[in-house]
């Protein structure tokens, strides 16, 4: 299959992975019924294909009112009660988004079949996966998954928690939240403070606190976990005063609250773009919001599709200050955390999706200065920093392949690695932090990706959810199966005890001043001081050089 044919499917992989299971008919527990604060819900008995493992699934449970009409661009409100027994056997609507990024024919070619899921603003639902033996009083650990997708795409039903729930005896909850403009648009004032998607996540966590006991979960043992923008969400909840007490552990996979593209102190740029695209010639925020609430779904979707990525904002409530300030001031209540990255975050999928016009494979020593100058501007750095980036990452090498590899490393460091290390350093003095670098290149990608790609963005998700046991006919090795089982065990141990270690697993040391971390590969091992030189460059050397540059420019102006 040519690489371009795989783009749609890999877009889905970047935000998550579809792990479908087979529904089976049966007696009694085949139609489990559970209570919630707003009514009863009926689920399904599900067997993971080719195993005797059974789980109960409850799909499409509302945790808030539909965010439509006057509730568009407003905080979520508690769901309305219902009478009778609600059907929880079909997937909920996914939130309004550019569904072209979710893949189509390419999924079928890989024997991956997306369920036919409709799209609607009425999308604030969650899915629950519970071991079939669980009942009220089982007090199982709860793992709440927040999907990624640049805060613009994704859905809960791409992630099937059945294998993780059944093999590790945990309750898995996958939640949805408003995306794109509908989820994160802000006017910067009281008329639309923004972060609606984050507020949806808070509402879902409150629902879990109130109701998960009826599904066999322990509300006092909740771990939130997510990847990419989902990891950013998790990290943002750690520092948000609105989320305190709603969870007790946090797992951040390739995403933290200070990712440069997913947090902004100002909403001005997005505000201006939306105002122009909408045709709402508003003289003030109040009239703009009135106009936007009057748009239909198709009109809002057209605006949404302009944004491949959209940032959360400092809104004064969910995020009283920039996350970096909140961490530096210790103005938060940290919980034990697993934080990690993959060793090739900008290897292939992200440049393919986010910046297809930039042909990394065309970089040479001759073209590099212009490329780095442009890249520095995109990073919100002075263009003169291009020379510093060249010196740090490329040195004097002339070899194009080496230059291209170093460029990809530089982008991955800036976007994911350095922010993750910064957050780990902030948090480790207040609560245990376990850091990892995922290093395994999945074998089933060997025919679809360039050979230089290692562990790309999103690759670990397959293993976290036990991909090889789902209804997926992809080749995998025995070693990969063992690695998947180890990762699920680490994650579930952490959810259960706040510590990933247990007998039979390679030891994972806490990240302290020795800077130890786990190298997650077929043969896991302990590393030390991950990217110490690069961390020094991005957090000390580069800021100092920028200050010197500004000082020089100021003196030049005075002359």
UniProtKB/Swiss-Prot annotation:
Source species of the chain: Mus musculus (Mouse)
Matching Gene3D superfamilies: alpha/beta hydrolase
Gene name of the record: Ces2e
Protein name, entry field: Pyrethroid hydrolase Ces2e
Described purpose of this protein according to its UniProt entry: Carboxylesterase that catalyzes the hydrolysis of pyrethroids pesticides. Hydrolyzes trans-permethrin at a rate about 22-fold higher than cis-permethrin. Also hydrolyzes trans-cypermethrin. Hydrolyzes retinyl esters.
Taxon lineage: Eukaryota, Metazoa, Chordata, Craniata, Vertebrata
Record PTM Phosphoserine, positions in chain: 552
Protein modification: Glycosylated.
GO molecular function annotation: all-trans-retinyl-palmitate hydrolase, all-trans-retinol forming activity; carboxylesterase activity; trans-permethrin hydrolase activity
Leader sequence segment: 1-26
